């Protein structure tokens, strides 16, 4: 993988990730394909929304179908028939989400398989091996996603262990002869001094890109913005920056304003299945009775398959009848909305008009522009 940086507007960056499998224009949003599928969508439909890279989930694919089944097909690209690049998370977030059924040690994490209750152990080395078998174009180190809230002492211990695990991840990745990209993950909760230590430690080890982890886990938005404003300038300018698990459309806008290049989140697909649809002027909750006789398109400014062909009344009808097609059409629209948003941000950065784009984005939704505390 090669990262090319074209231009900046304030702290926002316009560039691209170049892979053997294709080029990804940045800033970018990566749809989440947890089990080797973006829920309800064929790879061709995902690509048609404008997505150039997707995310797969190491933890879930390790449990089902497992490494051996994956290797029978070649790798994850062959298994799911996605032709473009794939980023896989390390499994750390899912393991730490298991709560009481897991035990963290210096060596790794002991837990019970949530499917059948069998005892399982996952460590940095195993995570690198699974992601190698998946053929991931971007591999994420194995780390502990520090929960929120966490006091300073806990956050410090967690961050320091994640640094040690980052070194082990790097060593196993290299010993496997993996020619793809490996990203480090910056931790430290909401504490700037801990984030400083994490960034420096990861840069000293050396990675192909750097993710900001441990945000969007319940902390106030002001804390997320503050940490991004503090951390992003410390990440080497020639490396891509990835904000993990984020987020709402406004979170993508605010991340880009602060220098983030890559995002992923289940929100557009999950919300689509619940009838919560993103449009230029805000949100449409399609199961609301007021849409029963609305013959207009979901979003008049959207060019997706759903908006070009179907009315709000039809989408409302499908939702009320729990029809699978409704979830699919909603997902197509939400994913296209996110890709159109990212394309708009990229164009605005190219033209040096980002703040004008941001102002218009919020005004269309009747909201104030959040403050930006950068030099």
From Swiss-Prot:
Entry's Gene Ontology BP terms: queuosine biosynthetic process; tRNA wobble guanine modification; tRNA-guanine transglycosylation
Enzyme nomenclature, EC number: 2.4.2.29
Effect listed in the UniProt record for changing residue 90 to A: Loss of activity
Effect of residue 90 to C: Loss of activity
Pfam families: TGT (PF01702)
Protein's pathway: tRNA modification; tRNA-queuosine biosynthesis
Entry note: cofactor: Binds 1 zinc ion per subunit.
Effect caused by changing residue 307 to A: Loss of activity
One of the record's GO cellular component terms: cytoplasm
GO terms assigned for molecular function: tRNA-guanosine(34) queuine transglycosylase activity; zinc ion binding
Effect of residue 316 to A: Slight loss of activity
Annotated residues for binding of substrate: 89-93, 143, 187, 214
Amino-acid positions noted as binding Zn(2+) in the UniProt annotation, renumbered to this chain: 302, 304, 307, 333
Quaternary structure, from the entry: Homodimer. Within each dimer, one monomer is responsible for RNA recognition and catalysis, while the other monomer binds to the replacement base PreQ1.
Protein name stated in the entry: Queuine tRNA-ribosyltransferase
Organism this protein belongs to: Escherichia coli (strain K12)
């Amino acid at each position: 993988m090669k990262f090319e940086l074209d231009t900046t507007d304030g702290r926002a960056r316009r560039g691209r990730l170049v892979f053997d499998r294709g080029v990804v224009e940045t800033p970018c949003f990566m749809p989440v394909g947890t089990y080797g599928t973006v829920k309800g969508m064929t790879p061709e439909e995902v690509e048609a929304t404008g997505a150039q890279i997707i995310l797969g989930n190491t933890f879930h694919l390790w449990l089902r179908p497992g490494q051996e089944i994956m290797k029978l097909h070649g790798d994850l690209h062959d298994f799911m028939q996605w032709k473009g690049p794939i980023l896989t998370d390390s499994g750390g977030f899912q393991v730490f989400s298991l709560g009481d059924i897991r035990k963290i040690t210096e060596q790794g994490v002991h837990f019970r398989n949530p499917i059948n209750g069998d005892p399982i152990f996952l460590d940095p080395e195993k995570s690198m091996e699974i992601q190698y078998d998946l053929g991931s174009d971007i591999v994420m180190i194995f780390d502990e996603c520090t929960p929120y809230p966490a006091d300073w002492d806990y956050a410090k211990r967690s961050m320091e262990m994640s640094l040690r695990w980052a070194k082990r991840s790097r060593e196993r990745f290299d010993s496997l002869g993996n020619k793809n990209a490996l990203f480090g993950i910056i931790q430290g909760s909401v504490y700037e001094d801990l984030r400083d230590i994490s960034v420096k430690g990861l840069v000293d080890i050396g990675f192909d890109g750097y993710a900001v982890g441990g945000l969007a886990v319940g902390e106030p938005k002001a804390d997320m913005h503050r940490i991004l404003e503090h951390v992003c300038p410390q990440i080497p300018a020639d490396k891509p920056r990835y904000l993990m698990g984020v987020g709402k459309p406004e979170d993508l806008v605010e991340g880009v304003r602060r220098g983030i290049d890559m995002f992923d989140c289940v929100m557009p697909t999950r919300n689509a299945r619940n009838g919560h649809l993103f449009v230029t002027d805000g949100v449409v909750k399609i199961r609301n009775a007021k849409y029963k006789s609305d013959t207009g398109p979901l979003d008049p400014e959207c060019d997706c398959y759903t908006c070009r062909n179907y009315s709000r009344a039809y989408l409302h009808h499908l939702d009320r009848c729990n029809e699978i097609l409704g979830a699919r059409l909603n997902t197509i629209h939400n994913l296209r909305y996110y890709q159109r948003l990212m394309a708009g941000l990229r164009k605005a950065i190219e033209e040096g008009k980002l703040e004008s784009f941001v102002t218009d984005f919020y005004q269309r939704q009747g909201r104030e522009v959040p403050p930006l505390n950068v030099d």
